[in-house]
Regions:
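Polytopic alpha-helical membrane-helix bundles and their juxtamembrane interface segments
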Residues: 1-54, 61-81, 88-226
Length: 226
């Protein structure tokens, strides 16, 4: 039986959904600033990738608010923007962080392979779940590389915060995808998501504070023209 989005969400629940979106968006901005501090050439691409992630989250939150309001207004394009924006945005952030880890800008094209394949698969099946898988993989990758960067700086608390983010990224989507959930369960899931995204933001802030400003000239990615 198809789920009617107009009866799925309460207005207060839909409004609260903006909080984890804003926390995640702030986290991606801070990560972009941290990456740019260590490797100036990746600053703008990382910030643009973070903006793409935030755009997708805001589009989904606005959609949820519109279907929860009276009268219900359902614009599926807003809902369907989420996973494409997450997949490509997270891929861009991952590329920037790999460059920071290596000390030189990474080639961007390998990081586009999975999002492009996910987009093609989504078009083929008429659903965005392939891009959901790509977004989850990229988000976990960001968490892992962020843990390594935090540990390299001796920041164990930062590593714990990013670990919480990874666990939440893996556990919450399957739970949230179950149909016909009670409002209490949805509040629990959304509150947990807020804490997960807060952990991501706090970990990113700690990473930014411990990232020194780059003073050395950057090494170009392998294969780049000189």
């Amino acid at each position: 039986m198809a789920i009617d989005p107009c009866t799925e969400y309460g207005l207060a629940l839909a409004a609260e959904d903006f909080l984890p979106v804003l926390l995640a968006g702030a986290g991606t901005v801070v990560l972009g600033l941290a990456a740019g501090r260590a490797l100036p050439s990746v600053r703008i691409p990382a910030l643009l990738a973070g903006a793409l992630v935030t755009l997708g989250g805001l589009a989904k939150a606005i959609w949820k608010l519109l279907v929860a309001a009276e009268p219900c207004r359902n614009y599926p394009v807003l809902e369907n923007l989420l996973f494409p924006c997450l997949a490509f945005g997270f891929a861009g952030i991952a590329c920037a962080l790999v460059g920071v880890w290596r000390g030189r800008q990474a080639s961007w094209w390998p990081f586009l392979v999975l999002p492009v394949l996910g987009g093609v698969a989504s078009l083929a099946v008429g659903d965005t779940w392939p891009l959901l898988i790509v977004a989850a993989i990229a988000a976990v990758f960001i968490g892992v590389i962020s843990i390594r960067l935090a540990l390299r700086d001796g920041d164990r608390l930062g590593a714990v915060l990013f670990t919480v983010y990874i666990v939440g990224t893996l556990v919450l989507p399957p739970l949230a995808g179950r149909p016909h959930q009670s409002e209490q369960l949805q509040w629990g899931e959304q509150g947990t998501n807020t804490l997960v995204q807060l952990s991501f933001l706090l970990g990113a802030i700690r990473l930014l504070r411990r990232t020194p400003v780059s003073a050395a000239p950057e090494r170009k990615p392998v294969g780049a023209h000189r």
